[in-house]
Amino acid sequence: MSDNVKINVNGVQIESEPNKLLIEACEDSGIHIPRFCWHKRLDPVGMCRMCLVEIETPRGKMLVPSCTTEVSDEMIVDTESDIVQKAQEGVLEFLLINHPLDCPICDKAGECPLQDQTMAYGPGESRFIEEKRHFEKPIPISEIILLDRERCILCARCTRFSDEISGDPLIEFIQRGNKTEVNTFPNEPFKSYFSGNTVQICPVGALTSTSYRFKARPWDLKSTRSTCNGCSMGCSIELNSSQNKMLRILGVDNDHTNQGWLCDRGRYNFEYLNSEQRIKSPIKKTESDYEDISLQDVYSDLNKIIEDKSSKVTFLLGSNLTNEDFSSFNEFSNKLGNHEHSIYLNEDIFYKGFFDEETDNAKIDDLNDSDTIVIWAEDLKETLPVLYLRVRQAVKNGVKLVVFGHANSTLTDIADVYYSEDIVSNNFEILKDISDLKEINEHVKGKNITAILGKSSPNQSDQSLEKLYMYLKENTKMKLFNAFNGGNSFGAFQMLDNVKGNKEFAAEISKETTDLLFVVGADPIGKSIFSSKIKNIIEEIPTVVSLDLFLHETSELADYIVPTSSTLGEKEGTFTNIEFRTSRIDKLVPSPGQTLSDWEFILGLSNFCKFEEMFESLTDLNNKSFKDFEIDTAPTFDNLDKPRNLDGIINLSLPNILTSEENIKFSNSLFVSKKLYGDKVTERHSKSISLLGSSQFIEGNESTFEKYKLNSGKCILVQENIEITVNYKINPSFPDGLIFIPKNRRNMNKLDFSKEIEIMPSLFKEALNVK
């Protein structure tokens, strides 16, 4: 406190950290200064002049923008003087001259800073009687964002976010003077993975989303805080509903994780909750169709199998379950006693990781405190998009960035060092001794490092990552992220005694090793690189039970399908993110029909089988799940509900990941990963983003495609009796010969990547042709 400066605001003395912006210092002391352009996560620009305050200077009193003025010791500030009030009235009067009277129909009405500040600080009447300026309204600037230029007050929040934060400067000011407007470039839509953030931070209704437009008023909404489970980042979110329907997701400013930002998939992938295609009651497959069946009959049929002591039971779990779901399956699996049982996680990129007591697990905040960030993992922008934003923020603040190719080509514009084909082979092997790399010695050796390490592609060997890991461990002060990106993967690591991945499932499971298979919240046939193998396995297993929301390629093969609640908004629990920070998942809307949580199903089955009672309630399950943690820091509901723990609690633990030593082999020089948008069943049933992951394409550099004599923009992937017509995209950062295939796009799962895939010129402009 002794280093703080003292300032006088409106006759009251307050203290602040030196060099802090005046608007922030006042905010911290409970003194509100109106603003439009200022946002605490963006660079200050002082454009709107709404935050003008009066300060005393040697030359007398002066009006200054508080968003660009730093505090100094003994500063005297007046935020309520007559001159300040007159300036505020003038700013608002100018803003309202051309602002349309759209409040009765505007989505922002009721939570609009322009409305609120006009009432609090504006003139009582308007002197303007001329015709207002008009534009075509609204205009779509992307598939999910609409722009109303009449409402725009030119605060530049959207343009600054796109430039400073996301690195997608696709929306800008055009024209000049009183004709200035915000718009996108001609024939270049606002195709950003983070465009929804501009809607949330827009202080008026100039930017709106197609998913929420004209749906509800803020005062009609019910809200709760929760955690996004779209990837392992664990972004804090606010869920909004009206009339028991989820209508909107907002980012919550959790300083430790997402700082208020969300990717668009995390923001808009909720509309499936209201889909009429949801499974609403248990069904059983017959020879020709499905028939309804009671849950008790499902339990009865499964109990007959479990009663047979020779039966072998296997679980294939999706990574979007809650910690409590994972814990319940783990306990049920253990209660099977002498049954041969195994638990697998529906993840293709699965390896032991680098978890040991000698290596510090990184926190997301460590990115800003590092000397250098080292990345070798799947494309962060596609798989951990908000972590990608945090990396960009750290680099903007002066942290050095070293990236090993070839997945993170989206970071080449900000990387200090990007190692491509000279250092990293097409199979993701390091070709030179790391200690001989000049740039490593300059930026990494002996420095404070935050490393983000994970396989870039399923065929990357464990040994290649281990080389980099061991070098960093021995030569730097390293903190490490293990870049597993699948939903609640880290919750699975904490809750399951041991866990394997899809590679092990495809190698170990057969009708000889499994009599009963539970597939829970997973569609490996639709999305895995082992799709064909897993399909053959599931078709042979005597009894398959699917717990899911929809029918899809995997659940359609099940003998019993039990509808479950969505982790997003329909059930309570906890979620553990990439830094082992556990936070609450909350319920806001009721589940449709006879759906139930996964833990409820397994508890009911356990009771029907007359096993010793596992737990009595969700709260009891939550407490048991974290019984081995310290009482004060265990992420129980009671602890997480305390105000100091709303952002989550970190508890480190060493997972027991069981993987085979055999590396995956691809026949071609292929690089297989996933894009942010894909063909996942929940995305297909979320109207706003359903088409964003529909296109099929491959990527490579220009010389690679020239070898295949491609020139029409399309080509055909041919393998045995399969033909898929796809677009091809040029990525100049790729080495010669390397081709990227997104595994989560439709029909890509039909390809067997271990076999030869021919690439042939396409003579026709067909969207898709699968024989």
What are these regions (language model features)?
Residues 38, 330, 369-375, 381-410, ...:
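A cross-kingdom feature strongest in bacterial/archaeal respiratory oxidoreductases
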Residues 48-70:
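N-terminal single-stranded DNA-binding subdomain of primase/primase-helicase replication proteins
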Residues 338-351, 401-408, 476-489, 541-551:
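A generic structural motif
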Residues 101-130, 589-645, 714:
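N-terminal leader/propeptide and maturation segments of large enzyme subunits in energy/redox metabolism
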Residues 450-510:
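A glycine-rich, hydrophobic/aromatic-adjacent loop/helix-cap motif
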Residues 406-407, 413-437, 454, 569, ...:
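Short alpha-helices
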Residues 207-213, 246-248, 340-342, 403, ...:
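Acidic/polar loop patches that form or flank catalytic/metal-binding clefts of enzymes
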Residues 2-27, 35, 39, 56-60, ...:
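N-terminal export/assembly segments and adjacent metallocofactor-ligating motifs
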